[in-house]
């Protein structure tokens, strides 16, 4: 072996290695555990001890609850004037017995801040209730508007359907009586027209629109119902052509769809 090589079995090399016997780390861990336990107990004792403010508060409350002794100069003076311990104030002794309690201010708020805070809290509560009420009102109104809109749409669809049915019945009944031209263009269903007829109809519509406003589907249905009942004694909701006006009035519930719902 060369002289410059390290001898790993020599005493010089082995002495440099730290003592790693199993017992040494164990003793160290035990000491640390004991130290932690002592610190924990010390913290518990500190937590159990009352703070200076708490002790001061308890002392103050105990002093306020205890009666003034006769050794007090002021109390001794009252006794000389005839006052007895436990006696109420006033000539008859029927006044206050207990002293007026002290309300010691402990927070950092200025005088009157409690009233300001209370008033602000009340205002916030009122605003919150007002918002909740407004929200409920809007939701209710929205639901009602939706129902009204749906009902209106349903009624409009029914009116359009009744109008088309009335137009077909009017054309058929007019033809049976030899009537070849409707009383008004919309009394009969619309038919396909050639270009010349469309131009002529546009001119007629323009002249009519100058004279009167355009009728709604409900207006047309009412006019057409009156015509069918008066001329043909016919009711589209009954689906029957009656013999005469008396027969119609006796056996038909009425001249609207609502009259026939029952």
Curated annotation (Swiss-Prot):
Q: Cite the record's Basic and acidic residues compositional bias ranges.
A: 39-61, 114-127, 136-165
| Region Disordered: start-end pairs | 39-71, 88-169
**Keyword Coiled coil belongs to the record:** yes
What start-end ranges are recorded for coiled-coil regions in this protein? Answer: 41-62
Q: Which family would the database say this protein is a member of?
A: Belongs to the GPATCH11 family.
Name where it's found: Chromosome, Centromere, Kinetochore
Highest taxon of the source? Eukaryota
Question: What molecular function terms (GO) are annotated for this protein?
Answer: nucleic acid binding
- Looking at the keywords, is Coiled coil present? yes
Q: Which GO CC terms are listed, alphabetically?
A: kinetochore
Q: Which UniProt keywords apply?
A: Centromere, Chromosome, Coiled coil, Kinetochore
Q: Which organism is it from?
A: Danio rerio (Zebrafish)
What this protein is called in its record is: G patch domain-containing protein 11
InterPro entries recorded for this chain?
A: DUF4187, G_patch_dom, GPATCH11
């Amino acid at each position: 072996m060369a002289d410059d090589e390290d001898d790993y079995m020599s005493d010089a090399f082995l002495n440099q290695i730290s003592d790693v016997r199993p017992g040494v780390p164990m003793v160290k861990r035990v000491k640390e555990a004991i130290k932690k336990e002592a610190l924990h107990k010390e913290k518990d004792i500190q937590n159990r001890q009352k703070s200076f403010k708490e002790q001061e508060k308890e002392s103050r409350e105990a002093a306020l609850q205890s009666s003034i002794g006769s050794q007090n100069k002021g109390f001794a003076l009252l006794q000389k004037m005839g006052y007895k311990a436990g006696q109420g104030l006033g000539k008859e002794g029927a006044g206050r017995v207990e002293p007026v309690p002290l309300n010691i201010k402990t927070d950092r708020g200025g005088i009157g801040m409690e009233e300001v805070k209370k008033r602000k809290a009340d205002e916030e509560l009122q605003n919150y209730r007002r918002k909740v009420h407004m929200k409920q009102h809007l939701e209710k109104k929205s639901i009602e508007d939706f129902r009204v809109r749906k009902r209106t749409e349903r009624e409009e669809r029914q009116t359009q359907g009744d109008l088309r049915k009335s137009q077909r019945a009017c054309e058929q009944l007019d033809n049976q009586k030899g009537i070849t031209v409707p009383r008004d263009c919309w009394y009969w269903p619309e038919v396909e027209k050639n270009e010349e007829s469309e131009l002529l109809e546009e001119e007629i519509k323009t002249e009519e629109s100058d004279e009167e406003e355009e009728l709604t589907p409900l207006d047309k249905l009412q006019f057409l119902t009156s015509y069918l009942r008066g001329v043909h004694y016919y009711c589209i909701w009954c689906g029957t052509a009656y013999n005469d006006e008396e027969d119609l009035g006796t056996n038909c519930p009425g001249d609207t769809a609502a009259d026939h719902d029952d």
